[in-house]
Curated annotation (Swiss-Prot):
One of its GO terms (molecular function) is protein tyrosine phosphatase activity. Residues 26-261 form the Tyrosine-protein phosphatase domain. SMART domains: PTPc. InterPro entries: Prot-tyrosine_phosphatase-like, Protein-Tyr_Phosphatase, PTP_cat. The lineage of its organism: Viruses, Viruses incertae sedis, Polydnaviriformidae, Bracoviriform, Microplitis demolitor bracovirus. Belongs to the protein-tyrosine phosphatase family. This is Tyrosine phosphatase-like protein H5.
């Protein structure tokens, strides 16, 4: 490793060490050292009191240097959920640009992904605002949803012809396709205040264990291949580069680190 705290080993040296009786202890000791390294950067916006309820976990910061900055709304919009066309405008309390989400580079492509925490009940509107503002067309969810929103609030309706409304954003479910290990869904995202609308392709993988990695890496590889294929198709049809792929995960850690190439 390149850090002064760690010794760089050749392949032969490493293979020799694997035969030592205390090999596992050495690995754990080095792992603890890695975790103890203080990362450079600030997370001022994450720490602001007005943003605390938007964060799912206090111990996982949102770094300032790569965070997604929302465009602050000029007004707050309230809707009659039985009639999305019924709009009430009120002055916004505090224009907010914060969402727990960061740009992440892909292989040979800068800002290919946005890795974010799974939406909470009070951040679903911010989530869809981010998707629309960033010109994103693909979402890859790596976790199950739950009605209580403890892991991930249901930010779309998993039923054809279903509809969810979060603030000014209406999300309609157009089509659901069941694959062998994940579900593909076509959604229609609409901002009822500006009439901006976009079709969203949602990939949903729900077999990630609570601890560890997926049992079948082939399933994840298939998901990545289909995701990249769809993105290529959409890019060719649009004639311009699409926005980042949005990847929500509960703790923005294990799942995203494993998935994001």
């Amino acid at each position: 490793m390149g850090n002064q705290s760690f010794k760089t080993l050749s392949i032969d040296d490493f293979l020799q060490i694997t035969g030592w009786p205390d090999f596992s202890k050495l690995i754990k000791k080095e792992h603890d050292k890695v975790l103890a390294v203080q990362l450079p950067g600030t997370f001022v916006n994450f720490s602001k009191p007005q943003n605390s309820l938007k964060n799912r976990y206090n111990e996982i910061p949102c770094w300032d240097h790569s965070r997604v900055i929302l465009i602050p709304p000029s007004a707050k919009y309230n809707y009659d959920h039985t009639d999305p066309s019924h709009i009430t405008l009120t002055p916004t309390e505090i224009p907010s640009t914060y969402i727990h989400a960061n740009f992440v580079n892909g292989f040979k492509e800068k800002r290919k992904f946005i890795c974010c925490q799974t939406p909470k009940k009070n951040t679903c509107e911010h989530f869809w605002r981010m998707v629309l503002e960033q010109e994103s067309h693909i979402i890859v969810s790596l976790t199950k949803t739950d009605k209580g929103g403890f892991v991930c609030h249901e930010y779309w309706l998993n039923a054809e012809e279903g509809m969810e409304i979060f603030g000014r954003y209406v999300i309609r479910t157009l089509e659901i396709i069941k694959e062998s290990s994940f579900t593909k869904t076509r959604l229609r995202l609409t901002d009822v205040c500006t009439d901006a609308s976009r079709e969203i392709h949602h990939f949903w993988y729900t077999d990630w264990p609570d601890v560890g990695n997926p049992i079948s890496p082939v399933q994840i590889l298939d998901l990545i291949l289909q995701m990249n294929k769809k993105r290529k198709e959409l890019t060719q049809a649009a004639g311009f580069k699409l926005g980042p792929i949005v990847v929500p995960a509960p703790k923005e850690s294990v799942e995203q680190e494993y998935f994001v190439p």
